[in-house]
Amino acid sequence: MDFESVLAGWDGEHAVVRHDAESGAWMFVCVHSTVRGPAGGGTRMRVYPAPADGLADAMRLSAAMTWKMAGAGMPRGGGKAVLAVPQLPAGEPRRRLLRRYGELVASLGGSYRTAGDMNISPEDLDVVAETCPWVYGTTSGGGNSGRGTARGCLHAIRATVKHLFGSPELAGRSILVQGAGAVGGVLAGELADAGARVLVSDVDEARAAATGCETVAPERVVETEVDVYSPCAVGGTLDAESIPRLACRAIAGCANNQLAEPEDADRLRERGILYAPDYVVSAGGIIQLIGLEDEGWDEAHLEERLAGIGETLRTLFAEADAESITPAEAADRLVRRRLAEARPS
């Protein structure tokens, strides 16, 4: 499929497509919305079946960032970048590619501000920052956003448990964390410290075992009986095939795009499974980076704002119950309202 076909019907503001001859990589920067402020979103580096798949990924994720920023009440719009590479580079070729990518982002004049994502570390962002001033999450900046993402997810799980059981206390509650990476691994430790019975699953069994928690084979995740299932790895795990097999009471995780399609929110409601909308739950990372690097917050104020994720969910759950809608629809209403309020009349 060609790039024009992929872009057809996209409701974003602009997309930048550049081929990097030296590395063979394609650079895609998608700015979905700047209505609430400059677009923010991470950069991922990945090998795709075809370059057009990388563009489609950037488009989809940039739209999700618009909703995440608005849902978190942050003064930013949504964007995303993808470096679609023939193979993951290392050493000096990687460094040169990242510097050229920084020049591309800098040429956009601050309309898009980037951070880390898949296969992009704080050290990589240091290199990007050599040629671009619009970089979050360097080693000298707000740091790895996984800390804020995990902490925000913890507050989200507390709010979810309170709605289900009447108390936010996690002691004795069973929680399955899917993904033991930079976010899931930290989250598992926080949950264990709070007294929860924590189960962890990861495609890398050694990484799951390193958390010190009870482990679950990846193929058994959906059917494992727990109070809360917390997807913190790949998206799209909730669909027409998996939802009927779920054995959890609620879902609250920070993986992006957990629902394979919007109708899956209705499927969860029909099963009596409480769903915390993913873009609300996962906003802690952007809150951390923007708050510490742009807004000048201290750690105490950052923690207050991360706790606000739980407050937002409590409001959404109450609205969903009162109006007999899904929490996902309640969250979408909130975002649409905030975007409409920001648009010039």
Please annotate each region the language model reported.
Residues L108, A194, R271:
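Conserved dinucleotide-binding and phosphotransfer motif residues
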Residues Y112, V198, T215, L274-Y275, ...:
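Hydrophobic beta-strand scaffold residues
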Residues V161, R249-S345:
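Adenosine-phosphate binding glycine-rich loop
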Residues V203-V281:
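Rossmann-like adenosine-cofactor binding region
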